[in-house]
Design a protein with these regions (language model features):
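N-terminal alpha/beta PP-like core and its mobile active-site loop of ThDP/TPP-dependent enzymes
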Residues: 1-340, 355, 375, 379-382, ...
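Active-site diphosphate/adenylate-binding microenvironment
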Residues: 6-9, 14, 32-34, 347-428
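Glycine-rich phosphate/pyrophosphate-binding beta-alpha loops
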Residues: 26-29, 74, 91, 154, ...
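Secondary-structure transition/capping motifs at alpha-helix termini
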Residues: 39, 228, 382-383, 403-407, ...
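Thiamine diphosphate
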Residues: 112, 268, 458-551
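Phosphate/pyrophosphate-binding active-site segments
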Residues: 134, 293-390, 516, 523, ...
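Hydrophobic, well-ordered secondary-structure elements that form the walls
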Residues: 296, 376, 388, 427, ...
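Catalytic phosphate/nucleotide-handling subdomain of diverse soluble enzymes
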Residues: 420-464, 468
């Protein structure tokens, strides 16, 4: 069928099942957007290119599908670099389609030219520069395959402007042939037999859940394994929701701001079953001492992650969609016996969990983060998707907000990108229109992409935005308070910005809570809004996130929290 390159892109997106595009137009993609217009293809005009790429990211995380975004050349696609890196660090499947200057202008420092392929090489799974229209169908087919297969990740397709204009006989390939890359990994079953044998020999096992369980959609299979073995569970930030937070022996998040029970379980276990996690430094603390008493079994699809940071005694390298069903099958005959074998250990870790709840305090004239999270939780459905920005509120959400389903907790874990949350929540809502979507943000993070408030209003996207307002960059402020002699350099925001007024000006119904006694009534009104809504809630400006493992310390060298910042058993339970 004869068509131009721009039309070929739209037809290819349809064949790949793409439902919506996030983007921002410009000179090199005008022909592409003209085809979007003629086709009436669903697209969202964001307020900034970073909003577009984070929107595609949130869509991908919530749905499990490939997110797609468009940008023009030069500053347009350069504005997406942070979002591409965010997706790369968290293994999120994206296809980023950017315009490039015309082929005869490439390499001449032309107007709005940037070598985006070179810029993004370290932060994409693969990228392409398309200078021949006949290559476009193959490249797009490969891009979607690479993005979603194996360990997912972002793929950039940079297309010269004249390629969009050129006409050719379009035919979309049915298969992908990439030499040396299959995208499907089945490991050695003998490694699984070793893992089962280690479980049989263990008396004090712990399961560490990572984001790989979420991205592979194997949470239900893993839940079956957990229920059979009745094994204590700890989670990474990215793995939150893979096992319901309400599971009896779920000890919470591990690592820098993990629970005492989770961190002490890792320190005291004799077997660590780590599934779909890459042992990030925020999880391990001092990696040389991480789970030092334990035999470590590491399940991961990416061979590069095996033994990269933490040495594993048994490594099961392969797709979790292959390995976890086999594991479930292999423990069927021994699971009940093993559950009994682990009974004393379960009791021990549960007692620690009860004795050392996450720290929280009630301060006059302010709403505590714990109270806010719990009151929000009461008002939303179990199926609600929670997004966060980055900072203290992110950790409080991980500690105090119970998530019971996979793909229902969206956060920037690897890169820690402030400004991620609002556009990601927008993308999640568009991908999952039947679900409630709630964003937790801080008064620092929300400013970074607040222009997307207008996008919510323009498209009537009913995200509910909860901003914890303390007038400071909370996590930076906390570190300065604890480790830099209270030198609050460049971390105090002040009280001049009225973000409720900003939201109102952008067409979003806004609320504010300055008196803690008003919280419940205002939250009721907030959640009753039909459409997007914004609420900012005053929290203590000097509140710290505890527990905390200082950088470079061992997991059992936690500051648990208290009025004097010393170890204490006071506080309020996380769950």
């Amino acid at each position: 069928m004869l068509m131009n390159g721009a039309k070929a892109v739209i037809e290819s997106l349809k064949k790949e099942g793409v439902e919506v595009i996030f983007g921002y137009p410009g000179g090199t993609v005008l022909t592409l957007y003209n085809e979007v217009y003629k086709d009436k293809f669903p697209n969202v005009l964001t307020g900034h290119e970073q909003g577009a790429v984070h929107g595609a990211d949130g869509y991908a995380r919530a749905t499990g599908k490939v997110g797609v975004c468009f940008a023009t050349s030069g500053p347009g696609v350069c504005n997406m670099v942070t979002g591409i890196a965010t997706a790369y660090m968290d293994s999120v499947p994206l296809v980023v389609i950017s315009g490039q200057v015309a082929t005869h202008l490439i390499g001449r420092d032309s107007f709005q030219e940037a070598d985006i392929s070179g810029i993004t090489t370290p932060i994409t799974k693969h990228n392409y520069l398309v200078k021949n229209v006949h290559e476009l169908p193959r490249v797009l087919k490969e891009a979607f395959f690479i993005a979603r297969s194996g360990r997912p990740g972002p793929v950039l397709v940079d297309v010269a402007k004249d390629v969009f204009d050129a006409e050719f006989d379009y035919e979309y390939p049915e298969t992908v042939q990439l030499r040396g890359y299959t995208g499907h990994y089945e490991g050695n079953e003998s490694d699984l037999d070793e893992a089962v044998q280690a479980l049989c020999e263990s008396r004090r096992p712990v399961l560490l859940t990572g984001g790989g369980i979420v991205s592979s959609d194997t949470a239900q299979v893993l839940q079956d394994v957990v229920e059979k073995l009745q094994i204590p569970v700890v989670t990474t930030l990215m793995g939150k929701g893979a096992i319901p937070d309400t599971y009896d022996y779920h000890l919470g998040m591990a690592g820098m701001h993990g629970t005492v029970a989770a961190n002490r379980a890792i320190v005291g276990c004799d077997l660590l079953l780590a599934i779909g996690t890459r042992f990030d430094d925020r999880v391990t603390g001092n990696a040389n001492t991480f789970a030092a008493r334990a035999k470590i079994i590491h399940f991961d699809i990416d061979r590069v992650e095996i033994n990269k940071i933490v040495h594993s005694h048994v490594s099961v390298n392969g797709d979790l969609r292959w390995s976890l069903p086999l594991l479930a099958q292999k423990i069927q005959s021994t699971g009940d016996r093993l559950a009994e074998q682990y009974a004393a250990w379960r009791q021990e870790v549960k007692e620690t969990d009860r004795a050392y709840p996450c720290y929280s305090r009630d301060i006059k004239n302010y709403v505590s983060p714990r109270k806010l999270m719990q009151e929000v939780r009461k008002r939303v459905e179990d199926s609600a998707i929670i997004a966060t920005d980055v900072g203290q509120h992110q950790m409080w959400a991980a500690q105090f907000y119970d998530v019971t389903q996979s793909r229902h907790f969206l956060t920037s874990g690897g890169l820690g990108t402030m400004g991620y949350g609002l556009p990601a929540a927008m993308g999640a809502q568009l991908g999952c229109p039947a679900n409630q979507v709630v964003l937790f943000s801080g008064d620092g993070s929300i400013r970074m992409n607040c222009q997307e408030l207008e996008t919510l209003a323009n498209y009537h996207i009913p995200v509910k935005i909860v901003v914890l307002r303390n007038g400071v960059l909370g996590m930076v402020n906390q570190w300065q308070r604890m480790f830099y002699e209270k030198h609050y350099a460049a971390s105090v925001l002040g009280n001049h910005a009225n973000m409720s007024a900003v939201a109102t000006a952008m067409g979003v119904k806004a609320f504010a809570v300055h008196d803690p006694g008003d919280l419940e009534e205002v939250l009721d009104a907030f959640f009753a809004v039909d459409g997007p809504a914004f609420i900012e809630v005053d929290i203590p400006p000097d509140e710290n996130v505890y527990p905390m493992v200082p950088g470079g310390k061992k997991l059992d060298e936690m500051i648990i929290g208290g009025d004097d910042d010393h170890e204490t058993t006071s506080g309020t339970a996380c769950r």
